[in-house]
Amino acid sequence: MDFDEKRRILAERLRDELNLSEKVYNAIKKVPRHLFVPERYRTMAYVDTPLPIGYGQTISAPHMVAIMCELLDLREGERVLEIGTGCGYHAAVTAEIVGKRGLVVSVERIPELAEIAKRNLSALGYENVVVIVGDGSLGYEPMAPYDKIYVTASAPDIPKPLLEQLKIGGKMVIPIGETTQFLYVVERDNGVRKWSWGAVRFVPLYGKYGFRPLEE
């Protein structure tokens, strides 16, 4: 069975199990996850599990990428901030959904991973993704505000800069907690509302508003 067939089978299973919208299903079905993971893990690319990508980081399981996309209610033309680029896979899925009129700004604290993500995204023609090296807990103010924000590492609390960079009417998805983590949906309107989707497991967020500052 080739990678395309494995990807189709995974996408169909996630669609049925998670009741995915057509836009999220199509993005999962299209983005070649095997081209984002290290070569030694490519045979496992379409197993629904996280995989190591080096530097102590992982690529999220496909079901979690799909769930976060659904919770955000991503729409064509939106400007989205991603915290934690990793290998670029989640950004590619998001880019497929927001389309060429949209923009994904992704912040990665590990320069080597940022370079890997840039190469992966460029090789596949994703011109609507900008990868920045920096402290993700600070967001990226120069391109704010954002319609949607999502964080791929667990934070001690909602970082203040991310709330400030979220548009009024915008939505954020972020895991919060250390030993026990929960995935929260945060909505900014007149005030801030948040609700928990459920328990999750992510790597920790490091930075000024993370579990520890970045090393100088």
Swiss-Prot record:
<dbReference type="GO" id="GO:0004719">
    <property type="term" value="F:protein-L-isoaspartate (D-aspartate) O-methyltransferase activity"/>
</dbReference>
<keyword id="KW-0963">Cytoplasm</keyword>
<dbReference type="GO" id="GO:0036211">
    <property type="term" value="P:protein modification process"/>
</dbReference>
<dbReference type="InterPro" id="IPR000682">
    <property type="entry name" value="PCMT"/>
</dbReference>
<comment type="function">
    <text>Catalyzes the methyl esterification of L-isoaspartyl residues in peptides and proteins that result from spontaneous decomposition of normal L-aspartyl and L-asparaginyl residues. It plays a role in the repair and/or degradation of damaged proteins.</text>
</comment>
<dbReference type="Pfam" id="PF01135">
    <property type="entry name" value="PCMT"/>
</dbReference>
<feature type="active site">
    <location>
        <position position="60"/>
    </location>
</feature>
<comment type="similarity">
    <text>Belongs to the methyltransferase superfamily. L-isoaspartyl/D-aspartyl protein methyltransferase family.</text>
</comment>
<dbReference type="GO" id="GO:0005737">
    <property type="term" value="C:cytoplasm"/>
</dbReference>
<keyword id="KW-0808">Transferase</keyword>
<dbReference type="GO" id="GO:0030091">
    <property type="term" value="P:protein repair"/>
</dbReference>
<keyword id="KW-0949">S-adenosyl-L-methionine</keyword>
<dbReference type="InterPro" id="IPR029063">
    <property type="entry name" value="SAM-dependent_MTases_sf"/>
</dbReference>
<dbReference type="GO" id="GO:0032259">
    <property type="term" value="P:methylation"/>
</dbReference>
<keyword id="KW-0489">Methyltransferase</keyword>
<protein>
    <recommendedName>
        <fullName>Protein-L-isoaspartate O-methyltransferase 1</fullName>
        <ecNumber>2.1.1.77</ecNumber>
    </recommendedName>
</protein>
